[in-house]
């Protein structure tokens, strides 16, 4: 099976004819793609992470199952934090949730199964390993500064984000990311998977030197980013070249930004970008 990545990239070497609020609709027209040799098939993905020494999924996920409601969620996310005492637990959403703010996951081996419910103005900061977020919708128009502005920020190994929808309108001139996975050069993140997700991301960092990315992956070797649809509306911004050239931090806007992530698989994804503003700068760019 052969997949193609569709990515939008808009740049301007001479954009004098563009107006202040120029919009570029449907910027991608795809014709017949050339043959690409040796493109691997997406590997079969289990519903939940599987311990290779114990592949029985049911045995791994039925030790503790909690149905979350508005009446009991504070018993587990105490002051917004799921502590390590709740490791090895599967949480099942039973309704929509609003305005919970930033939820921090410190516990390990946790699954949050959404059952297609919606979380409005809720963000996740993942510090525990082996965490799965699956099958819910996030609708945000608030910048979560304690999560670097991300709707989902993971700093831990083996984070699995599957079948989620993220609709994020970042407040004007604020930092924001749909999904952000950030390791360090001396401590990279392993086991990251983002699969079958839809990200609708709208950024408005017209003037401030803040970052707006739908997806950011840094220091995550061997990550799997597969079968996602990423749609962005972003302004054109100048690339901030440093003394030795440009890197990811040189771009204030991007649909997808990936760095220092060797052997990452990016396959079967659709990425489409629309320009929502052209500030007065000499060489504005929007990277796909």
Name each region found by the language model:
Residues 1-24, 93:
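Secretory targeting signatures
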Residues 13-75:
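Low-complexity, acidic Ser/Thr/Pro-rich repeat tracts that form intrinsically disordered stalk/linker regions
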Residues 39-42, 164, 201:
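Tyrosine-centered aromatic motifs in long, intrinsically disordered, low-complexity repeat arrays
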Residues 71-82, 86-110, 116-122, 137-138:
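N-terminal extracellular ligand-recognition/capping segment immediately after the signal peptide
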Residues 92, 98, 104, 111-113, ...:
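Extracellular beta-strand solenoid repeats
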Residues 99-102, 120-125, 142-153, 171-187, ...:
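Extracellular beta-strand/beta-solenoid scaffold signature
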